[in-house]
């Protein structure tokens, strides 16, 4: 089973690691067979599974249910679970809700924010809960951002994001996840923290790992497709097409053919 120590080792060795969202046991088993390194039970299930307009209505109970299903289907990947909207607004809530999803099978929890999360990260870490902090475009704050848009477009904004990363890493964050930021910034942050694995989605190909929503990479997105998405399913055929798509994603992350330049945001900072 992949562990946090393995992710750190991968980074030290320069080996890129793969991450996909997953919400059920059958997909989890296919990801195990494809040797996907990390699985994120994301609150994206609100849209991908429940058909909602955003992640905001997702509950801790939802997250625990899907975490348990994924864990039963996959004994290989590191399992990371989102704490959903407003479920870590207080330290008491953060501890209780982290306990719930960890007992369901998560090995790490993910929360969205910046430097203001430092105390929460510190308390969770001291209580034995590894924490991934999601920065850049954070979907739980979509109404604050005014939509799903590229973040840290200027040097000033990029430096603020770096300061946020520094604060949460110093507080004990085990992993960083960057979403929708310039490729240059993704590289800067990955290089700035040699002992902290950095996962990217729309953050360039210099981050240590890459994550996609499974429905997106299987071509099950109806409507606008994000720039950072590649449809790995259309390259496959036959009864093993889904498994082959997962294998292709894993291989493309490792050899850095994904994300290609067309999947990234090239902004001079």
UniProtKB/Swiss-Prot annotation:
Binds 1 Mg(2+) ion per subunit. GO terms for molecular function: 3-methyl-2-oxobutanoate hydroxymethyltransferase activity; magnesium ion binding. The keyword Ribosomal protein does not apply. SUPFAM superfamilies: Phosphoenolpyruvate/pyruvate domain. The active site is at 179 (proton acceptor). Its EC number is 2.1.2.11. Keywords: Cytoplasm, Magnesium, Metal-binding, Pantothenate biosynthesis, Transferase. It is found in: Cytoplasm. Coiled coil: none annotated. Catalyzes the reversible reaction in which hydroxymethyl group from 5,10-methylenetetrahydrofolate is transferred onto alpha-ketoisovalerate to form ketopantoate. Belongs to the PanB family. Homodecamer; pentamer of dimers. This is 3-methyl-2-oxobutanoate hydroxymethyltransferase. It comes from Acinetobacter baumannii (strain SDF). The gene is panB.
């Amino acid at each position: 089973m992949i562990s946090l120590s393995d992710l750190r080792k991968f980074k030290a060795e320069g080996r890129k690691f793969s991450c996909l969202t997953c919400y059920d046991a059958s997909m989890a088993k296919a990801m195990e067979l494809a040797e996907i390194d990390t699985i994120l039970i994301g609150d994206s299930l609100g849209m991908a599974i429940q058909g909602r307009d955003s992640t905001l209505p997702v509950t801790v109970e939802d997250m625990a249910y899907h975490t348990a299903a994924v864990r039963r289907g996959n004994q290989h990947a590191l399992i990371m679970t989102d704490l959903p909207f407003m479920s870590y607004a207080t330290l008491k809530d953060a501890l209780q809700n982290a306990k719930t999803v960890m007992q369901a099978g998560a090995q790490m929890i993910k929360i969205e924010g910046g430097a203001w999360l430092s105390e929460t990260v510190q308390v969770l870490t001291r209580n034995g809960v590894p924490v991934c902090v999601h920065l850049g475009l954070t979907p739980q704050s979509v109404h604050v951002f005014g939509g799903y848009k590229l973040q840290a477009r200027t040097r000033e904004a990029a430096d603020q994001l770096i300061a946020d990363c520094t604060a949460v890493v110093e507080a004990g964050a085990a992993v960083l996840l960057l979403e929708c930021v310039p490729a240059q910034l993704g590289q800067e942050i990955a290089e700035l923290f040699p002992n902290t694995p950095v996962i990217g989605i729309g953050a360039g190909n210099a981050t240590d790992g890459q994550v996609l929503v499974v429905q997106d990479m299987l071509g099950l997105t109806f409507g606008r497709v994000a720039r950072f998405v590649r449809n790995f399913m259309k390259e496959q055929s036959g009864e093993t097409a889904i498994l082959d798509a997962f294998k292709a994603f894993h291989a493309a992350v490792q050899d850095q053919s994904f994300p290609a330049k067309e999947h990234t945001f090239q902004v001079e900072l």
